[in-house]
């Protein structure tokens, strides 16, 4: 539902929209729907207990007192505040003004507090351990972030990478086998990480060869590669890894490395500074991709090829070579991230253990509007939804288990369809370039 301004703005462009700008009612309508759903939930399933939010882990140097919230009072207070925000958002749209992003963030946080309070107040153990919830969310986000960075680079250079799922799975499989064969506590996982990156490059190499050199539809190639990697790894797992699990599928896991002092900061410390080597590498890769894309000659060439390959070719940029090598680089990043499944989380390879993470990463790329920082934040949102499912199950929340299993995917759908709006990707993404 949209409304178009019929008069020119009298204030600054940041506050009001001109006559050609379309104002969207999507935010107020979304706010109203979420508020109504929470109100119905709180009315039909009343929980009269208290909810306890634990802000410090037992090992933290600084202990912060727990926050105890009364269930009914907190939930209905949040509903009232959310209703007020909804009315304010509607007023902004009626006045031909955009709803700021910070308003959306505040609304989401208040809604989350209301839901967590309601869920904990009716649980067997009404304690929400926020340090564990946040640290676990980051851990579950790691492969999503690597996959999202892979997707950003690929699509920015003009190649739609549906094969992120296959690259993650190939990385998980290869890292498990290589680390198991080497066996040493530190050397095995480190070599396994490099092997995972190489396997991601191999999958990306096939994608690049067929889509760039032979002009095969990029989406079709990506889907075929996903099916191929799933089938190949499943076959090798059944025929090779399972009968020889002690030798080929028992990789040593990466150990957590706490950063002195920083790891003791309440909430933030356990989440960011008490992690494994692959997570610290992720921080560096995020920064490098962002700086490289927007502040280096390499990034300028990459983006020009993805936006206007003909113009890039005119000024002397080899379009095919630029696409080929950057798709391969993206595959290395995804393969490296896939190693987290075996070396950082589970500790052994299982069939189809990525469980659609590549497709959620692709959604994070769209949600993040092809920006590495925004895509990372989107992946963190999806990881938080996944870990919230685990946390509520542990505390014995009355939320049905079927809904909890659906929660990460519901958040993905709502984020991409409900809050992104109309976004435009790289102009030449998915279009083969044929040199005249």
Show which residues each predicted segment covers.
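Short, non-helical or kinked segments that cap or interrupt transmembrane helices
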Residues: 153-174, 190, 212-225, 301, ...
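Cytosolic-side transmembrane-helix boundaries in multi-pass membrane proteins
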Residues: 1-59, 76-117, 288-289, 307, ...
């Amino acid at each position: 539902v949209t409304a178009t301004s019929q008069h020119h703005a009298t204030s600054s462009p940041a506050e009001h929209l001109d006559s050609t700008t379309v104002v969207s009612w999507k935010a107020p309508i979304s706010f109203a729907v979420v508020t109504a759903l929470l109100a119905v939930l709180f009315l039909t399933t009343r929980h009269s207990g208290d909810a306890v939010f634990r802000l410090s882990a037992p090992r933290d140097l600084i202990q912060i007192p727990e926050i105890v919230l009364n269930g009914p009072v907190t939930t209905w207070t949040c509903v009232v505040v959310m209703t007020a925000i909804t009315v304010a958002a509607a007023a902004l749209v009626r006045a031909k003004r955009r709803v700021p992003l910070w308003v959306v963030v505040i609304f989401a946080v208040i809604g989350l507090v209301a839901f967590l309070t309601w869920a904990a107040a009716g649980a067997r153990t009404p304690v929400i351990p926020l340090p564990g919830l946040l640290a676990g969310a980051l851990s579950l986000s790691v492969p999503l972030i690597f996959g999202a960075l892979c997707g950003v680079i690929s699509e920015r250079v003009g190649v739609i990478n549906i094969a992120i799922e296959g690259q993650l799975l190939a990385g998980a499989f290869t890292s498990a086998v290589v680390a198991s064969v080497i066996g040493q506590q530190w050397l095995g996982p480190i070599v396994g990480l490099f092997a995972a990156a190489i396997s991601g490059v191999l999958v990306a190499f096939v994608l690049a060869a067929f889509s760039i050199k032979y002009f095969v539809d990029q989406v079709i190639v990506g889907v075929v590669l996903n099916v191929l990697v799933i089938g190949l790894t499943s076959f090798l797992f059944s025929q090779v890894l399972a009968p020889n699990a002690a030798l080929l599928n028992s990789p040593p896991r990466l150990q957590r490395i706490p950063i002195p002092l920083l790891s003791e900061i309440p909430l933030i410390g356990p989440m960011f500074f008490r992690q494994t080597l692959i997570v610290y590498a992720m921080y560096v890769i995020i920064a490098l991709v962002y700086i490289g894309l927007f502040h280096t000659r390499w990034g300028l060439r990459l983006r020009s090829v993805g936006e206007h390959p003909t113009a890039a070719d005119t000024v002397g940029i080899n379009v095919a070579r630029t696409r080929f090598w950057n798709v391969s680089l993206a595959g290395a990043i995804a393969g490296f991230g896939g190693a987290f499944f075996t070396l950082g989380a589970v500790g052994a390879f299982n069939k189809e253990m990525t469980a659609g993470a590549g497709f959620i990463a692709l959604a994070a790329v769209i949600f993040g509007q092809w920006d590495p920082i925004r895509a990372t934040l989107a992946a963190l949102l999806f990881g938080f939804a996944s870990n919230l499912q685990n946390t509520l199950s542990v505390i014995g929340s009355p939320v049905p288990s079927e809904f909890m299993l659906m929660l990460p995917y519901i958040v993905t759908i709502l984020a991409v369809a409900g809050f992104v709006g109309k976004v435009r990707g790289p102009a030449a993404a998915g279009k083969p370039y044929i040199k005249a």
